[in-house]
Amino acid sequence: MSEEMNDQMLVRRQKLQELYDLGIDPFGSKFDRSGLSSDLKEEWDQYSKEELVEKEADSHVAIAGRLMTKRGKGKAGFAHVQDLAGQIQIYVRKDQVGDDEFDLWKNADLGDIVGVEGVMFKTNTGELSVKAKKFTLLTKSLRPLPDKFHGLQDIEQRYRQRYLDLITNEDSTRTFINRSKIIQEMRNYLNNKGFLEVETPMMHQIAGGAAARPFVTHHNALDATLYMRIAIELHLKRLIVGGLEKVYEIGRVFRNEGVSTRHNPEFTMIELYEAYADYHDIMDLTESMVRHIANEVLGSAKVQYNGETIDLESAWTRLHIVDAVKEATGVDFYEVKSDEEAKALAKEHGIEIKDTMKYGHILNEFFEQKVEETLIQPTFIYGHPTEISPLAKKNPEDPRFTDRFELFIVGREHANAFTELNDPIDQKGRFEAQLAEKAQGNDEAHEMDEDYIEALEYGMPPTGGLGIGIDRLVMLLTDSPSIRDVLLFPYMRQK
């Protein structure tokens, strides 16, 4: 911290003491506002300067917020007060507010939170303003804000001190308001479709429902190892068994993996399950829901991302994973008959694989390394190999593949879904195959979950399921390049 900053803080501490000496509480209590800055503008900006003079008796307002600018000398001054909706100018005159309140005004610093009661008027330049009749200090700020002309430029500081970012960067505030709206519209859409929102445990006895490394914790009283959930899936499907036919949960998921522009150790997902549906129905639902959210929150289903127009309005492409790989590389995995042939093709095309990988894993590596980043417009990739889809139903026409899809937009995965595997015998066999992979060194392979198998043995109806990473969806709809831009408090390495 610079010497100048220390000096500014010292001055503010002295002002704080002066307030106490005068019997003024520098951390005040409730203040009744008549509205936000946007409300005042909507109601009063339509009038001319002269009309506002005529309406002065009816234009009494009360506004509160943070002082962001301040200017003027002598017996009057202007400032801008910022609230959630934006900024509005205030005008403070000694002969209007009195000596004591004008002294408060003179000693106020940028960053202080104030309340102003007054009447509406327009300046000679036509700016709608509040002429103060009463000026109240609500909270004394003891630290100066970042430079008003440059805002908070250090990207890491923006993430570590999000509160400063929200104060100084209007775009950040808009992003997080839109994040809330996106989640709300998701709920509205599903509730209107008859889905029931539920809550399931975040600490699991078995880490299941996804291929990921879990965070491990310990329950002292029970002397039990527990895992922070890596997916919501298996508990929701137990509810389908129990007769709750359309369920969803929006919640935090935890994966003990790397941090990047696309990944945070804890993130928000929605998972939903619908009895008597299949992955085609879930494709339709996903496309309709995302389009609805974009229209409701942004006013358009054509959105800008990284300089590219993403068309969520037109019908989304649907492409089998084998066809996608064939289009990109010329390799037709329908014709590949063995793991050895797949490995030879990987070597020929420069695909990095592990020695333990089989046909399905290698096909998926072809896709991830040669196709994924090219899928800019919304594209459903379906038909994933059985080896990498332990919870999805096999395709009845070709059991090498499953009735599963992933949604790709701007070159990254946004959703994962499938017709759920409801055959308990097949499911147990898949879990056993996953255990074999774990024994060969795949630490992301699925554990055996006997309790889930038991639930399936009571009978789960044909079901379609979906998982969407909400953070990535918010990135898309707010044109944010990093997941940290859409998390209020992203994980940061310790200083």
Curated annotation (Swiss-Prot):
Its EC number is 6.1.1.6. This is Lysine--tRNA ligase. Binds 3 Mg(2+) ions per subunit. Gene3D superfamilies: Bira Bifunctional Protein, Domain 2, Nucleic acid-binding proteins. Its cofactor is Mg(2+). Belongs to the class-II aminoacyl-tRNA synthetase family. The gene is lysS. Keywords: Aminoacyl-tRNA synthetase, ATP-binding, Cytoplasm, Ligase, Magnesium, Metal-binding, Nucleotide-binding, Protein biosynthesis. Pfam families: tRNA-synt_2, tRNA_anti-codon. It catalyses: tRNA(Lys) + L-lysine + ATP = L-lysyl-tRNA(Lys) + AMP + diphosphate. Mg(2+) 1 binds at E406, E413. One of its GO terms (cellular component) is cytosol. Homodimer.
